[in-house]
Design a protein with these regions (language model features):
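Accessory recognition modules or surfaces
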Residues: 7-8, 43, 48-61
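Generic "edge-of-domain/loop-turn" microfeature
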Residues: 15, 47, 61, 99-102
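An amphipathic, aromatic/His-enriched active-site/gating alpha helix that lines ligand/cofactor pockets
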Residues: 17-39, 55-95
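Acidic/histidine-enriched, glycine/proline-rich intrinsically disordered or flexible terminal extensions
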Residues: 89-91, 97-106
């Protein structure tokens, strides 16, 4: 089991637009492809921060799902073109994590 903690920086004034877009378009699309989204959050004080966690059974599953999502025509033509206006892609931070034995989320 592995997890991705994904942290994004919104472009100024775009947080609400990003949250609407990811919840209406990105998360449903990715979950339909088989990705498991654990949750998503916005910063309480840091209003430009968006964080979400995805879970994968294995590295092989992660690689397969990345290919199915990011190489799809839907992603390339409908999703990706909108992302640039909402988040600063150069500041995306992805931390890969493994649960500890006592973790409530495994």
């Amino acid at each position: 089991m592995l997890f991705e903690l994904r942290q994004y920086r919104m472009r100024p004034g775009q947080r609400d637009n990003w949250v609407s877009f990811i919840e209406a378009e990105i998360i449903p699309f990715q979950t339909a492809k088989g990705m498991k989204i654990i949750g998503s959050w916005v910063g309480e004080e840091d209003t430009d921060l968006f964080v979400w966690i995805r879970q994968f059974e294995s590295e092989a599953e992660r690689e397969r799902l990345y290919k199915e999502v990011y190489e799809s025509d839907h992603w390339k033509t409908k999703v990706a073109p909108q992302i640039h206006d909402l988040i600063d892609r150069e500041q995306i931070k992805v931390t890969r994590m493994n649960p500890t034995p006592g973790s409530a989320i495994k």
